[in-house]
Amino acid sequence: MIIAVDVDGGDYAPKEIIKGALKAAQEYKIGLILLGKKEVIHVHAGHYLKKYPIEIVHCPQTITFNEHAVEAIKGKPKSAIVIGTSLVKQGKADAFISAGNTGAVLAAAFFILGKIDGVERPALGAIITTRPHIPSLLIDAGANAECRPNHLDEFAHLGNIYAKQVLGLEKPRIGLLNNGEEEAKGTKLTLETHQLLKKSQLNFIGNIEGHDISLNKADVIVTDGFTGNVVLKTLEGLGDALLKLRKVGHAIDSAAHLRGRALLADVGLGSMVKGMDFEECGGACLLGVKGTVIVAHGRSHARAIKNAIGLAKRTAEKGVDKLIAEDVRLRTLTATEGEQNHVTTPV
C-alpha cells in the first residue's frame, strides 16, 4: 500500500504534514510518496527517510488557497496536487491526500482521475462522531453547493457503500437532512429527493432534522454540499468551544476543577469533544471518482494527517471506488430492464 501525500498544502505545511506522514508510516506499515520541495522534505524528515519506505517526488510549483481551482491545476502541472492525483491515475499510488486548496484537489480528481461511469456528481463524505464510538457519514460535505434531487439520490447510494465498507455497517440507515421529519415538509429539493429515496432499495428512514445528527438517528446523512459544509463547520466549531470549556475547567481552582470533571463525566462531554474533533478522522473522502482521494482540513496538524492517511489506507484496501462502479452498473442495468419491461408492443 502506497499513499501519496501533499506536503505543501495546509496552514501548518510542510512541518506538520511531514510529521504526520512519518507517524503514519510507522503505525500503518505502508509506503509513502511525499510530494513537495525536495530540499524542504529532507530538512524535516531527515534520517527517517532511510528508516521507512518513503519516496520523494520534487514538486517545484505550489497551489495556494486563494487560487482559482481549475486555472491552478492547468497552470501548475508540477504542483503536488496535480502530480499526486496523476500518481493514483497511473497506479503508482493507491491513494492521495492533501490539506491544500480543496477546490483544486476536487478539480484535479475530476479532470485527471475522472468520474466513475454513471456518476454525475462525485461528493465528499465526511465521517462524524457525535456519540462515543458511533460514527456516521455526512454527504455531501462540500463538493456540490447546488444540487438536484437525482444528485442527492446519488449521494445516498455513494454513502451507503462507504458506510458498509469503511464504517462496517451491514444495513446503513439513510436519512435526508430536512427542516422537519414530515414527508410533506421541506423545499422542492428535499421533497422530490424524499420520493426518490422512498423508491430506492436503500434502508431509507425518512427525513431527519439537525438535532438528530447528534443523536445518531441515521448512519448516512444526505444533503447538498452547501448545507453539509455548514453542518460540518458548525460541529467543528462546537467541538472547539467544548474543548476550550474543558480547558477552562482545568485552569480554575481545585474544587471547581473537580466539579467540572464530574460534569464532563456525567454528560460525556469528553467523548463528545473527541468525536467532534476533525483531527480524529483526518479528512473527507471524495466518492464517485476513479481512485481514492482524501481531502484533509486546512488546519490539519500531524495527528490529523496521520489519521487521514489511515482513512486513505482503509478506503483503498476496501476498493470503495470499484464497488461504487459495480453498484452503479447494476442499478443502471436494473433500471434499463425495468424500462424495457414497460414497453408495450403495438397491435
Curated annotation (Swiss-Prot):
Top-rank lineage group of the source organism: Bacteria
InterPro entries: FA_synthesis, Phospholipid_synth_PlsX-like
Intrachain disulfide bonds: none
Location of this chain's protein in the cell: Cytoplasm
Pathway membership: Lipid metabolism; phospholipid metabolism
Annotated Gene Ontology cellular component terms: cytoplasm
Keyword Ligase: no
GO molecular function list: phosphate:acyl-[acyl carrier protein] acyltransferase activity
Protein EC: 2.3.1.274
Gene Ontology biological process terms, A to Z: fatty acid biosynthetic process; phospholipid biosynthetic process
UniProt-recorded name of the protein: Phosphate acyltransferase
Description of how the protein assembles with itself and partners: Homodimer. Probably interacts with PlsY.
NCBIfam families assigned: plsX
Main location class: cytoplasm
Record HAMAP family: PlsX
PANTHER family from the UniProt entry: FATTY ACID/PHOSPHOLIPID SYNTHESIS PROTEIN PLSX, PHOSPHATE ACYLTRANSFERASE
Gene responsible for this protein: plsX
Assigned keywords, A-Z: Cytoplasm, Lipid biosynthesis, Lipid metabolism, Phospholipid biosynthesis, Phospholipid metabolism, Transferase
Function: Catalyzes the reversible formation of acyl-phosphate (acyl-PO(4)) from acyl-[acyl-carrier-protein] (acyl-ACP). This enzyme utilizes acyl-ACP as fatty acyl donor, but not acyl-CoA.
Entries under Pfam families matching the protein: FA_synthesis
The organism's taxonomic lineage, starting at the top: Bacteria, Bacillati, Chloroflexota, Dehalococcoidia, Dehalococcoidales
UniProt similarity note: Belongs to the PlsX family.
Record's catalysed reaction(s): a fatty acyl-[ACP] + phosphate = an acyl phosphate + holo-[ACP]
